[in-house]
Regions:
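An N-terminal, well-structured beta->alpha segment
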Residues: 1-69, 75, 157-170
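Generic, ordered loop/turn and secondary-structure boundary motif
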Residues: 7-8, 13-16, 86, 121-123, ...
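Pocket-edge positions in alpha/beta enzyme catalytic cores
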Residues: 20-23, 83, 129
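Short, charged, low-complexity patches
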Residues: 24-28, 84, 134
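Generic secondary-structure signature for well-ordered alpha-helical cores
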Residues: 37-41, 78, 139-146
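Ferredoxin-reductase
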Residues: 44-125
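Gly/Ser/Thr-enriched, mixed-charge loops and adjacent short helices
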Residues: 118-170
Length: 170
């Protein structure tokens, strides 16, 4: 798999449904692992202290790709936090808003593109990854493609916390 072929500007995009799929769960898992390691390098933190938030839109392939990316993050040794269905701005704002403040985030979406496509948008505290930063993640993913996961991080969901918060405010 040539990960650079998934590049669409500063995002990753590919066919996620049907024959000829290029953005598969295995690819999303490798990209999650690569992004966790990229963020660790950028923040200077050990990967075991890195946390990455994940969200998705309503596309049919979203839940599977989000879960795969979360598994990749955890297999790198980092913490993956599943925000479930949310907006792209929410994934960036999660990094900046007091409270959890993950070190990075991934939004699983293909924006306005046809339903069979999907993609990944990557964010750090500086904003969405730029063209060259995405190249770093894709090159890292390429080098990790055959690597077996060694570390085990954690995958958590915000859904329980949100439900509890909703109950206490009524």
């Amino acid at each position: 798999m040539d990960y650079r072929k998934l590049k669409s500007g500063s995002d990753v995009r590919g066919v996620a449904v049907g024959e000829g799929a290029t953005l598969t769960p295995d690819v999303a898992k490798t990209l999650g692992m690569a992004f966790a390691r990229y963020v660790a390098g950028k923040t200077g933190k050990p990967v075991e202290r890195v946390s990455i938030a994940l969200g998705r839109d309503s596309r049919v392939s979203g839940p599977q790709l989000l879960e795969a990316a979360a598994q990749g993050i955890a297999s790198a040794g980092a913490k993956a936090v599943d925000y479930g269905m949310c907006t792209t701005p929410a994934m960036y704002m999660a990094i900046l808003t007091d409270g959890f403040r993950p070190d990075g985030s991934i939004m699983v979406t293909a924006s306005h593109h046809p339903w069979q496509l999907n993609g990944l948008k990557f964010f750090t505290a500086e904003g969405g990854l730029g063209f060259h930063e995405l190249d770093e993640v894709l090159d890292l993913a390429q080098s990790l493609e055959t690597e077996s996961p060694r570390a085990t991080g954690e995958i958590v969901s915000t859904q329980t916390r949100t439900t509890k918060s909703s109950r206490t405010t009524t």
